Amino acid sequence: SLLCMLALVSWVGLSLPIQADDLLLDDEFDTEAIFDDSEFSLDNTDLLLQESPYQWQLKQGLVLDPQATQDPTNSYSNLHLTAETTLGLSGFANIDLKATQDWLTGQWDTEIYSSAIQISTQQGAFKLGRYINSWGEVEGAGVLDIINPAPGLTDPDRGFKPQWLVAYNHYMGPREWQLLTNLDPDIAQFPDMSATKQASREWGLRYKVANSGSDWAVYAGQFLQNSPTLGLVNSLEQLTAFEYDLLGFSYNQARGDNLFKFDLAWKQGLGQQVGNDLTQVERLDMALGAEIKVGERQWQWSLSGNYLPEHTHEFSSVIIDPLTFELSLLPSSQWSSQYGMGVSDSFANGEFNWSLNLTGALNGSMTGLISELKWDYNDNLNILFTLAGITANADSELAAMDGLQRVGVELEYHF
């Protein structure tokens, strides 16, 4: 499914020259990580008491280019310390401290990766901290899952990024209101270029109704583009994260073990190169998704598209020459669409889990394949093997990634 798109693009792009890596990132290819709002549930308080309040996790990763014999394209270590506790009978708090070592560059970094305090009542829950908040149904399509930015192409962590959020959920039986604000929206960082942010805050409102076997929701808000728009104005580079308005709708329907999903969003104010100017336009985003279970095997399908109603022949996108890394303009289509197909299963009584995902543009300008095999060696050690490749046309936005292949292994320890 499109869940693998950013996982693929970020992973195979780890060894690209940095000028191409981040400039190629675009909201339309956001993917990876299934969000979950379950922490807002009162039922989870008891589960926290059953687990150890402190946990350590160490990841050691190595990425290689099978077409080359030189040094690895990436080698890293991530150390997480997580702690959580209940706050009386109506709340909980957690924190995840992360330390990262890049063995190729020698760079060392520490951060509060995530942290949250939640206080719940019978009718609602207030949550403050740095965490992931779920919007939309078709994960990774970039239609409504726009609150948490996707990782950059050089980021080994392929999950969506926690944000500093304040949110309140109000429950009315099967209905639910959510009001949230992002106190400091993150945007993708481009090397040697500074981006202009049109806003310092985001806000959003969701009304959700759960029915038997299905639910639907409507959305509204003002947001900042997760990935700034790169433009050429009078032959000069200009990088801007525009503020835009959003109206959206989502729906899902369960049929037995299968789930069918739909997202729709109208976005007003997105950045777009038009002629020699970088301006703001309207866009309609939509996505269809399905999760089909056959026995123990899980199939995922998705189709997403973007429509520019104000499109003219002057609409274009900035692309990077894969050899010179010079910027140029590529005419933009009024419609753009992507697809995703994936399958996952396990064997040896669940000791081994595998997945295979194919994703790309419907016009054939880009195709990517990623496969993973996870070995649960014991309760404390998991080993992940990954193989990926990508092809892209010379006149596409991802031309600099054509022909890339990557093989990786990651060891994950829990103690």
What is the meaning of each model-derived region?
Residues 87-188, 208, 390-392:
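Outer membrane beta-barrel
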Residues 54, 89-95, 123-126, 174-179, ...:
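Repeated loop/turn-to-beta-strand initiation elements of outer-membrane beta-barrel proteins
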Residues 252-359:
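Detector for outer-membrane/organellar transmembrane beta-barrel domains
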Residues 16-71, 78, 155, 176:
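N-terminal periplasmic/intermembrane-space "pro-region" immediately following the signal or transit peptide
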Residues 75-81, 111-115, 162-166, 201-205, ...:
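Hydrophobic, lipid-facing positions within transmembrane beta-strands of outer-membrane proteins
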